């Protein structure tokens, strides 16, 4: 608590106030100096939170000296605006405004380490501004006490005034420990000044006391004579019944009309004890028949006057201390907000924006989970009814195998529609997604995980898939050989390489111009194994081309197909290990089984688009498809055993559109594969795994 350290005898304008000292106005004749001790605002002796202090030091270091100086200045409007919002007591608000105005005029360092400028601006001392630890203690240790202090002040429910500014506090109350508290907080100089009683003030208290208790004329005259003896106007030796012991400890100054009271604590307590019945409301007979009784009444009035004075000092001290604390904490809070706003401007984002961003992120994650659940339920309902009706050509054993594969969502039966006698090799795979449609050509293997595809890949192949990878890395550029979607589109080269379909090493996937260009360059290295092998490959290509051309004649009558509402997904897959004969496909027409591959490619654009649409409109005039380019790369002359670098560069220069649209091709294949996986999520474990991986990415 603040202490009373001095008395302003010549006026407060001439007194040299030190730091944290303010004048305390008691009455017209008394003004004391009020001082706040250093331990109230100790900036070095607190144990701070290490993590918060480290963060504050980092934020403090972000600001330049100029920015820090600007941040550590607030105007009086900001302080008084916060005052009107936080403090409900009108007496407290007026006291804070009065004290702030006094400090602006006088310039006293009453709020150190805060300073008040002549223009009404509030700032911090230079030593505290440059020391991050002191500034942190000021902002987050002392500054955090503002709301607690305001909430701790008792307030009236009627007018929201605090007890110190309520009208009831001006009335003297029964004696308690308040006078002792304020007596202990006074210096010796202040005590001597308090017990110096002005005779005119004592006479006013005495007259009020006589009127209140309605003394008779004789008794009133006796009391007044005892008062005149005390102030030295009458000679005590001439008064009969005068007791000098009653006035012991009292000394008068007739010329200055002062009464000096002994400032010993015991004597003050005894003197105030005489006035206690008056404040307690006790009734006693008020008579002064003799002069000694009149002396006791004078001592009672002296005790009343002294108690009222001490009570007034205690009230002023408490009110001014509360006013000083409010102004100090309001200034610290305003400076802290200014500092944080400056730091937020430097950082570019505020704490409120961070909080909103966190809420938005949580909402986004929640919506994503709900969308995944809805999509999962939608796919489950869409693929709920799946049936596989066996053809008449299937045997009883094959029907059992087909039912088992339907349960596991994998079909591995041989292709009877094509008339092929080779187990595990199929020409046409039809996937029926409607329960009313029948499979015209049972699948012989899983499209993605079939052993035929795995068998066809060379041991040196990296499993590239034209920029689309089902692995977590997803960084491999691919060849059409590893892509089942390319098989669906009819642009794969499975039939072009036979047993060695992946004849090159796709090592630098993303760094190369295109993996297929390197395929064409490296595919010639295998020509050194012999000319006979190359001739065989060439004959295979010719047979495959004839096979594709003859497939148009194998299309069955549209009347044999199911209704237009049924959706059929057909995957055309060529044999990679054995020669494919055109007659094998056409035999299905003789057997009575329809082969609607060509017509289905026209009716289902999402799974079978022409090769030209895959490459987009930017492929350029005269640009060849990948199938034709691959055919040309295989159908080289017997004498040519390698491709020179000039030819490679020439090819890359002539096919710039392919490289410019490379990302479009990848995205197109990725979308196709996603559609395929969504439709076959219940059948293919790899499809569900890919959808989970793609959703996470």
From Swiss-Prot:
Expressed in heart, brain, placenta, lung, liver, skeletal muscle, kidney and pancreas. Expressed more abundantly in heart, pancreas and skeletal muscle. The keyword Phosphoprotein applies. Disulfide bonds: none annotated. One of its GO terms (biological process) is negative regulation of receptor signaling pathway via STAT. Keywords: Cytoplasmic vesicle, Developmental protein, Differentiation, Phosphoprotein, Spermatogenesis. GO terms for cellular component: cytoplasm; cytoplasmic vesicle; nucleus. The keyword Phosphoprotein applies. The modification Phosphoserine is found at residue 360. Interacts with GGN. May be involved in spermatogenesis. Strongly down-regulated in 40% of primary laryngeal carcinoma and in 6 of 10 various cancer cell lines. This is Gametogenetin-binding protein 2. It comes from Homo sapiens.
